[in-house]
Regions:
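Non-heme di-metal
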Residues: 1-60
Length: 60
């Protein structure tokens, strides 16, 4: 993989991980169960994206 692609993947991975943390922080803060569950599902989805980016990075 070229340096540009690697840089993009690393940036995307970092962004996904930060988003997971952000969504989980919101889920911990809100009292409404439906909203909390929605943010937890969104965090899990973002974590799945991070796993894919990590997979692509491991293929260098």
């Amino acid at each position: 993989l070229s340096g540009t692609v690697l840089d993009a993947l690393e940036s995307a991975l970092k962004d996904e991980q930060e988003t997971v943390d952000f969504y989980l922080d919101i889920a911990d803060y809100v009292k409404d169960r439906a909203i909390r569950d929605a943010f937890k599902r969104a965090a899990a989805d973002e974590q799945n994206h991070a796993v894919w980016f990590l997979y692509f990075l491991s293929k260098r």
